């Protein structure tokens, strides 16, 4: 198949108020060209709506009928993300007729990993049929449900794209990709077609929630609070005893599985330092689970903008962190690019989840296509 232009959309569980939207040219196996990338801010009313939706989702917890707010939020975010796609494409001098497919991840409102004797559950809000009717192009969406129904974790799905990036950079098994979003996830490849991916632990979500709870903004900007604080080593050691961290992969997390309450009772600075150290230390424990411990981590996602977390990856995880830009990648765009890449795989009928990533029995296709 010849490479086609595809748009990818991602809004993370950290709820930073932005739509990540990226355009790439790909055949679903290699990246032929990187197009533009943008952060399109949600209107404040949609951001507040999504915060309330996530709160109601936690109360619902997959029991009984879905909250009515889901339908309202789904339509609002679908229309807003459709507008973001159109603006990016037309700003690049293309029309929607030039776009082969849009990868619409939607907004994860709740994710529950499978347990012995029970399948997992996952819910992403996003109306692919509505987006198709607005944009007039094919839309791949609902990427995770089929994997979960087949007994998989439903996450992480970025491994196929991360592996393509590593292959294009010519790295070996001493380098892995770490994405620091609301949750942290890692992808490792041996360079010969075998790869592993899983969620390592929390990243930005508990830290951001902790900062917000003190009325000090949306995040620990530039890692300043964490840098000024002192890690509570006793508390950190206790947190690192959590069974998830030593459990074998495949494994996945919801953004609320590790919460801001981990820092209860600490000053803002010490809490930020301790939560940052926990993120980095959890990555270190994850590296110990891999077939070979990498020496370098290429870091994407919002967390790489936090110098405190980046330096703690070196001191607490025993690895050299490298910003994605050092490889010529766009660290804020990787997840949106990923869903453009996966959309082309959905279009081509190629697998998007694998035994080494989500734990499904065999490589499997996923996603639905509105056309």
Curated annotation (Swiss-Prot):
GO biological process: 1,6-anhydro-N-acetyl-beta-muramic acid catabolic process; amino sugar metabolic process; peptidoglycan turnover
Entry keyword annotation includes Secreted: no
GO molecular function: ATP binding; kinase activity; phosphotransferase activity, alcohol group as acceptor
Catalyses which reaction(s): 1,6-anhydro-N-acetyl-beta-muramate + ATP + H2O = N-acetyl-D-muramate 6-phosphate + ADP + H(+)
UniProt EC number: 2.7.1.170
Keyword field contains Repressor: no
A Pfam family recorded for this sequence: AnmK
Pathways involved: Amino-sugar metabolism; 1,6-anhydro-N-acetylmuramate degradation; Cell wall biogenesis; peptidoglycan recycling
Binding positions for ATP per the UniProt entry: 12-20
Enzyme kind, highest EC tier: transferase
InterPro entries hit by this protein: Anhydro_N_Ac-Mur_kinase, ATPase_NBD
Key words of the record: ATP-binding, Carbohydrate metabolism, Kinase, Nucleotide-binding, Transferase
UniProt record similarity statement: Belongs to the anhydro-N-acetylmuramic acid kinase family.
Its biological purpose: Catalyzes the specific phosphorylation of 1,6-anhydro-N-acetylmuramic acid (anhMurNAc) with the simultaneous cleavage of the 1,6-anhydro ring, generating MurNAc-6-P. Is required for the utilization of anhMurNAc either imported from the medium or derived from its own cell wall murein, and thus plays a role in cell wall recycling.
Stated name of the protein: Anhydro-N-acetylmuramic acid kinase
Organism of origin: Rhizobium rhizogenes (strain K84 / ATCC BAA-868)
Gene name as annotated: anmK
